[in-house]
């Protein structure tokens, strides 16, 4: 399988000079790093080339790396039923730089790109209707960014007296905790069930006889 994926990476890189910035085969999967300006060209090639025929778009999603200058990855997953293989495309961008929409190539990307915009604030040029998909119309911020507060900015509830949904400032019943979202250790719990029974000493073997 790895040989097939390496051959596919070489084929795409040779056909699209300059569009493929890097490739990686790991765990039986091929990932191509793509120049954002070339994503539509790459998607079209992968769909139409006889050696590819990636006709199915599985997903488009965002990933947030706050410490990076270009903090977002836009990740595309495509499937070729003809070749029985999947491919992953990645492009890097920031909060202000839009990525070309691939809706003209894969119409099914429409809601995927809207979700990435809603959850991360990633912008897509050429999208037919780039608006929020999962959050409310007046929602403030993008909830899957790692610097988005876990409490949110407002509470939403139904007021029976007013007979409508109302928005109120968040009320915290305990002191606010500043979550260090860049630390790999924040929130890690190493105490496992049964650890409280351990004495810290190795068990004593039973006496013979």
Swiss-Prot record:
It is an enzyme of class 7 (translocase). Its EC number is 7.1.1.-. Its main location: membrane. The keyword Transcription does not apply. GO terms for cellular component: plasma membrane. Keywords: Cell inner membrane, Cell membrane, Membrane, NAD, Quinone, Translocase, Transport, Ubiquinone. InterPro entries: NADH_DH_suC (IPR010218), NADH_quin_OxRdtase_su_C/D-like (IPR037232), NADH_UbQ_OxRdtase_30kDa_su (IPR001268), NADH_UbQ_OxRdtase_CS (IPR020396). It catalyses: a quinone + NADH + 5 H(+)(in) = a quinol + NAD(+) + 4 H(+)(out). It is a peripheral membrane protein. Coiled coil: none annotated. The keyword NADP does not apply. It holds the Pfam family Complex1_30kDa. One of its GO terms (molecular function) is NADH dehydrogenase (ubiquinone) activity. It is found in: Cell inner membrane. NDH-1 shuttles electrons from NADH, via FMN and iron-sulfur (Fe-S) centers, to quinones in the respiratory chain. The immediate electron acceptor for the enzyme in this species is believed to be ubiquinone. Couples the redox reaction to proton translocation (for every two electrons transferred, four hydrogen ions are translocated across the cytoplasmic membrane), and thus conserves the redox energy in a proton gradient. NDH-1 is composed of 14 different subunits. Subunits NuoB, C, D, E, F, and G constitute the peripheral sector of the complex. Belongs to the complex I 30 kDa subunit family. This is NADH-quinone oxidoreductase subunit C. It comes from Xanthobacter autotrophicus (strain ATCC BAA-1158 / Py2). The lineage of its organism: Bacteria, Pseudomonadati, Pseudomonadota, Alphaproteobacteria, Hyphomicrobiales. The gene is nuoC.
């Amino acid at each position: 399988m790895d040989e097939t994926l390496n051959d596919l990476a070489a084929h795409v890189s040779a056909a699209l000079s300059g569009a493929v910035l890097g490739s990686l085969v790991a765990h039986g999967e091929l990932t191509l790093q793509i120049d954002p300006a070339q994503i539509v060209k790459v998607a079209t090639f992968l769909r139409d080339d006889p050696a590819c025929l990636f006709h199915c778009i599985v997903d488009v999603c965002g990933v947030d790396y706050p410490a990076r200058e270009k903090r977002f990855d836009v990740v595309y997953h495509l499937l070729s039923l003809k070749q029985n293989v999947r491919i992953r495309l990645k492009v890097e961008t920031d909060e202000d730089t839009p990525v070309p929409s691939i809706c003209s190539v894969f119409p099914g990307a429409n809601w995927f790109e809207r979700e990435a915009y809603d959850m991360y604030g990633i912008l897509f040029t050429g999208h037919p209707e780039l608006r929020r998909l999962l959050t409310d119309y007046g929602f403030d911020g993008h909830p899957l960014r790692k610097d988005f507060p876990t409490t949110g900015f407002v509470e939403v509830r139904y007021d029976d007296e007013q007979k409508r949904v109302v928005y109120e400032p968040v009320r915290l019943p305990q002191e606010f905790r500043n979550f260090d979202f860049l630390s790999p250790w924040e929130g890690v719990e190493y105490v496992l069930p049964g650890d409280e029974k351990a004495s810290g000493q190795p068990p004593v073997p039973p006496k013979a006889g």
